[in-house]
Each structure stands twice: as C-alpha cells, then as structure tokens.
Amino acid sequence: FTGYATACLHEHLPKGSSLHSLEADAETAHKTQHFWQENHPSHQVQWHVGEALTVLPKLNLQPDFVFVDADKHNYSRYLDMCLPLLKTGGVMLFDNTLWSKRVIIEKDRESDRDTQNMHAFNAYANALPNVLVALLPIRDGITLVTKLD
C-alpha cells in the first residue's frame, strides 16, 4: 500500500485537475502519504482518511473519473453513491471484478461468498439504465462504468 495506483493516475492528470485518494486505515494512510511525499510531491493530490462510504458524501465532488479498488463487498454501494455525482461521460473503474476468474466459473460462484458478491456486482452494474458497462478480462478483471446522461 504505497499509493501505486494514485501515482499511475497522477502521472496522466491534466494540469489544473485534482486527485482525491481515500484510505480507510489511518496507519496505512500515513505510510502511503509519507512514501508519496518523498517520491511524488504534488499539490494536485488530496488525501482523505476514513471509510469511503462516510467520507465521500462530505467531499462535495463532481468527478470525471472514480477508481475503486477496496472494500469489494460494497462495490454496488460505491456505484450507487458515486454515479449521481459523476459528470456525464465520466467513468468509474472497479478493479478485481473477475475475482481470479472465479466469477465466470459457475462452481466457484456456488461455493464462495466473495465470488457471489462480485458476480452480483457485475450483474447489477450491467442492469443499470443510462450507463455503458464493459468488463475487461485484463489481469484480475476491470469493470468500466460510463455515465451516459
């Protein structure tokens, strides 16, 4: 947990833009911020500590892009919370949505609750109106949700 995803996103961040990074665990957040400040100092990155479902509503953001890679069992809740805030044409990216390919193997879905949750999230996202959903079989799976209007 060194902020690698944040560093990758920051590398392509347009001038005048900002990046908000949330971490639930205070100790991990402190280590990440320390590593980040030593290796990637930037005023474009704002750090927030706390549970995302609690912190996000307080930020008053209208993002173009949201990257979700934690708290997998709440992916649907993050989608419900962030989609109304997302600008039209904005994208949400959810990581690990093939769950080591178990999501596509029916016998694995039957026996593993985490796999069932991830499968349910993908089905839920795909059924939403006014979005375009793409599940990409890259590494552990990426689900992209684009807000159409």
What are these language model-derived features?
Residues 1-149:
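S-adenosylmethionine/decaboxylated-SAM
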